[in-house]
Amino acid sequence: MEMLNAIILILFPIIGFVLIFSFPTKTLKAKTASPSNPTSYQLIGSILSFNKNRHRLLQWYTDLLRLSPSQTITVDLLFGRRTIITANPENVEHILKTNFYNFPKGKPFTDLLGDLLGGGIFNSDGELWSSQRKLASHEFTMRSLREFTFEILREEVQNRLIPVLSSAVDCGETVDFQEVLKRFAFDVVCKVSLGWDPDCLDLTRPVPELVKAFDVAAEISARRATEPVYAVWKVKRFLNVGSEKRLREAIKTVHLSVSEIIRAKKKSLDIGGDVSDKQDLLSRFLAAGHGEEAVRDSVISFIMAGRDTTSAAMTWLFWLLSQNDDVETKILDELRNKGSLGLGFEDLREMSYTKACLCEAMRLYPPVAWDSKHAANDDILPDGTPLKKGDKVTYFPYGMGRMEKVWGKDWDEFKPNRWFEEEPSYGTKPVLKSVSSFKFPVFQAGPRVCIGKEMAFTQMKYVVGSVLSRFKIIPVCNNRPVFVPLLTAHMAGGLKVKIKRREQCDSMYI
């Protein structure tokens, strides 16, 4: 089967070149276009440039966007298809809010993730999306869910995360801190979403099969979008070969595992009768009368969103703090100022400097590097870029964080103070700026803005505070890590660290 997979990958370029050379030579001349757009040819579009840069797409797109006066580029694809990529905040607002209904995710996008996420909230449009959004928004605004989530967070940090890190200190071990944070986040999101405890933070145990299946399914689903020839992954799926065979097996594991948990939960609820004490999302969705498949798709979507985004953001923040001792010191000062009674929910909301650090880390290393919609009808972006019906339209948080026009000449510096109205000074309460979500769209914006945004900040601030007050995180490698974008981004090779217990442990403040 692997041989057949290779044949498919070889066959498509051959067919493409046969088609190219079936046309007059003049069709191979580059089309006249903006100098900021990649070189494009009739029929094959920019596939040559795309293929040349496919292993550095982030930097390639960012370089091209810097050359563009409007911070927007057009990438021509095979047979006339186009992708418009923008780092212009006005365009982002138009796509995500002003003309929201003209920019659904679209069938090409939902096809990519449909096998894994089905019709879940993050992979649906129209009435299906709207109905799920209303239900989820209602649940996420409930005080009971907020308190339930915070209690789980506190238990996971105190009873699992801190002991794991303490053990690493005592044994002098090097640990992959990215892996620790991913396992921690998976435990938390499964408890909140499913009311089920995978207990995967024990590093002496092998990675649970469900966790590995999620990783494989997410990676291969994301790589579908990077195929130079869009149809390749569909042919591989039809033939059940190569990566698509592995994807099918991983998705089967995910779906069967989650469905088994759902059936057990339904049985528990049927026996118990009253669901008032069942606070997890699964219990809430089942109580609302939704079918098993719809509930499965919804909770898988929330698990995918909740497990990787927060762990990715925190991984990059801890690395950035290791390079900026002065910033780490200011976070510790903020923690000390909260007193010795422990951090409650309201205390976390007031940790503005820690939040600024998280925002700055996500500006430079966004958990979701890009997101795409599809134009339902012809349109014109605010910068004058014309759109055709069916165009793929991508806004690009990674590139936006690197635009001088958006963030100034110091865009490449890690400066949490840029998020304040005035430079924070000792003894004064710093006031965070109101930064447009279209300038900083890491949580999306408009009607699709992330409904778990505040919950995510709560989790990240609590974890950062709990860890930093007790430990110094020291990367063992001095090289700059490599940012890898998939469904959610991660650090290539993980973040290998030594952990040192602080001489004056400030854990009394957590």
From Swiss-Prot:
Segments passing through the bilayer: 3-23
Annotated source species: Arabidopsis thaliana (Mouse-ear cress)
Gene transcribed to yield this protein: CYP94B1
Protein name, entry field: Cytochrome P450 94B1
Annotated Pfam families: p450
Listed cofactors: heme
Function as written in the Swiss-Prot or TrEMBL entry: Hydroxylase involved in the oxidation of the plant hormone jasmonoyl-L-isoleucine (JA-Ile), a bioactive phytohormone of the jasmonate-mediated signaling pathway. Converts JA-Ile to 12-hydroxy-JA-Ile.
CDD domains per UniProt: CYP86A (cd11064)
Gene Ontology MF terms in the entry: heme binding; iron ion binding; jasmonoyl-isoleucine-12-hydroxylase activity; oxidoreductase activity, acting on paired donors, with incorporation or reduction of molecular oxygen
